[in-house]
Amino acid sequence: MRDKVTGARRWVVKIGSALLTADGRGLDRNAMAVWVEQMVALHCAGIELVLVSSGAVAAGMSRLGWVSRPSAMHELQAAASVGQMGLVQAWESSFALHGLQTAQVLLTHDDLSDRKRYLNARSTLRTLVELGVVPVINENDTVVTDEIRFGDNDTLAALVANLVEADLLVILTDRDGMFDADPRNNPDAQLIYEARADDPQLDAVAGGSAGALGRGGMQTKLRAARLAARSGGHTVIVGGRIERVLDRLRAGERLGTLLTPDRSRKAARKQWLAGHLQMRGTLVLDDGAVKAVSQDHKSLLPVGVKAVQGSFRRGEMVVCVDQSGREVARGLVNYSALEAQKILGQPTDAIEALLGYVDGPELVHRDNLVLV
């Protein structure tokens, strides 16, 4: 199954606070430089990369001279504000030495729970990745409240992996992976090299609390892997202090714990599209569009749409029917009903002239279409 790692073309890499801050003694720039070298090697090998970086609060604590992690929200937010500056600058300067651009992206739970903001975040991240820029993502600790925080960056990393449809989520931690017993208490504990993410037996061995610098223990990493698995993604939980760990993972070495989904990404997404959203409208397709969608498995372009029915917003589910009313497919639209009315029957290169902007060349992308 390690071919799922070596064959992955889009990685989300999450690095924990303890690994970035030398266990609390400020940012460990030497360690960061080593990871950047490995991520640059991934990039040069044609792998698209997104980095989820913890460490803002921990770096801020060090700068402020705080020994223990505060519990008060306003103190945590103050530490995050101080630490985020240095954290992003450190990543930027280190990647720049290798000629790679980075982009800071701060997210809150609201950004991913609101459909419109979710789509905007997804479009931005996909554009950055396609441009060869490395997005550096963290939770926007300065503005979140207890009610809307992700809780830990493991969860954030899994949601980002789903957002960008990553093939692989790599969670770098201060442990070598998941063990069948607590290695701190049991010298006979064995590393679990591979398991299904939904295996209930993993819950019994994922106990233990987070470190003093972070919020996420092994239980949160297991939950993150299960969240990524819902969209068909694979997860590796692995020790960040293992020498050249990313290089060795890419080469197929059996490091850490590989947690696998129960179905492929495509099957998972199609199942979600088929059964989890309410239909908001209908697009009537001409014969050419019906063939393009159902036989050629292409995206639905505005030029092939004869009529728009119902009221829907960008990102909502619509039914695609032929001119006799027979359902052909369903999918998530890139444009609202009002916008679709203006561009139906028109070629893609006319969208900007008609609307003043372009949210996508297609009305429904083929990745967001499921045939019925």
Curated annotation (Swiss-Prot):
Record organism: Pseudomonas paraeruginosa (strain DSM 24068 / PA7) (Pseudomonas aeruginosa (strain PA7))
Compartment list: Cytoplasm
Record protein name field: Glutamate 5-kinase
GO cellular component, one term: cytosol
Reactions accelerated catalytically: L-glutamate + ATP = L-glutamyl 5-phosphate + ADP
Taxonomy, superkingdom: Bacteria
Protein residues bound to substrate: S54, D141, N153
Lineage, uppermost ranks: Bacteria, Pseudomonadati, Pseudomonadota, Gammaproteobacteria, Pseudomonadales
MF terms (GO), sorted A to Z: ATP binding; glutamate 5-kinase activity; RNA binding
